[in-house]
Amino acid sequence: MKEVFITNPSIAQEINTKTEEKLHQSVTITMIRNENPTATLGQFISHTTYQDLPEEVVKQAKRCILDLIGAAIGGSRTQVGKLLVGFIEECRTPKESTIPGWKVKASSPYAALATGSMAQDLELDDVNRMSHMHPGVSTIPTALSLCEREKKSGRDLITSTVVGYEVVNRIGKSVSPSILRDTVFHPAVLWAFGSIASACKVFGMDTEKCVNALGMGSLAPVAVEDPFRQGVMVKDLYGGWPNFVGIMCSILAMKGFTGSRVLIESDLGIAKVVSKKYDFSSIVKDLGRTFEIMNSGFKPYAACRRAHSAIDATFEILRRNKIDPKKIQRIDVGTFCAASRLSNTHPESSVAAKYSIPYAIALAILKGKVWIEEFDQNMLKDERILALAKKVRVHLDEELDRLYDSKWPALVKIELEDGNKYSSQVDWPKGEPESPLTDEEIKSKFVSTASTIIGKEN
């Protein structure tokens, strides 16, 4: 691939570069040096086509779309879903885009808002562990709603999804891992960039307009961590609101509204707001050659992804040993910093329970699964579960924390009353590229989440 490097942002405009060959079907774009990542991403969005996507990337995009739609349909009849759809119907917006799980249409921003929030509610949306992004929830709702509105094809849906994943994950990687070492949930602050990228691709916007749209991406909310600990509904809006913002920014840019051309890299830009460390080279390295969507981790459990290694380690102990839950004296969980905060032993809401490693481990031991119904409000009153959760101690393990974020490790130790001890360490939770879910497992997950709403026969 030929690459033309431009260092002057003032001439980083729409440039058509043609190459004599493509390397592994990679995207033909003009690259701008690392000090201009906002403009680089704008060009990537504008220039990328379906033909640029390798076969395995297309397949992965289909998996991601199916997974997200299943999570959204599953969350459509939760209290969050019902309240949001009721509110949106009261707004009487144009009937442009379908809200999954409902025979309701709304304007694209509102439909994407609902879809993202509903998908976030069940804690089943995908995660990129290296960027700490939830790329599906911040990208696919936008792509779905706008492709329906604009009457686009399935290929357009796939392309806009891949582009959104690429942009939001690369920005996330540039400020990781310190992004999760704070009281602000910075990933949600960045999610609008995925929505913006997807929207710009659906609209077919040129580089200049894409850059302006990205330059408005800081309008996403300052998403603090407290709602996760409190277990309140607003945390689900962290998944929905960036889609609303992203569509709005893209439409405004399409009409001529301007944003910062250096929003990501400026000394007053978004990177310096969300992280103490950043490396912009990760934004442009191999852009168009490797695709971040391939690094998505799919969730097999309805809980915060940071808890999954501990859940897997618990299941591994149970597979190897016959353990009587009544004989458990204590359970010790050492893990990385961001996961060690999930230490609540007595969650009072289903949301809080999904962010509790002690509760999840108790479910694994007593119920043999950690799925949607295990987080029902009535289950939170189960004295056996609560009593076992109180025996779980979660703490920061400095050695394991040094492996973060290339690994998300957890070491679980179970000690019985007779003194016997059992342990297991998991470095990559099930569903990561190193331990992937099969196509059949992803399909089964979709059926499990969606069938209660649309029926298995559909």
What do these predicted ranges mean?
Residues 4-132, 229, 234-244, 251-458:
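Terminal-appendage/accessory-domain detector
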Residues 49, 122-126, 146, 150, ...:
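Structural motif corresponding to the C-terminal cap of alpha-helices
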Residues 64-71, 143, 190-201, 361:
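Hydrophobic mid-domain F-helix/FG-region of cytochrome P450s
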Residues 120-173:
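Hydrophobic alpha-helical hairpins/lids featuring a short glycine-rich hinge
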Residues 130-137, 157-161, 179-192, 235-239, ...:
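Active-site nucleophile and cofactor-binding loops and adjacent substrate-binding regions
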Residues 137-144, 189-198, 244-248, 309:
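Well-ordered alpha-helical segments within folded domains of soluble proteins
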Residues 150-156, 173-183, 196-213, 224-236, ...:
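Active-site cavity-forming subdomains of large catalytic enzyme subunits
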Residues 163-173, 214-225:
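Long, well-ordered core segments of solenoidal/helical folds
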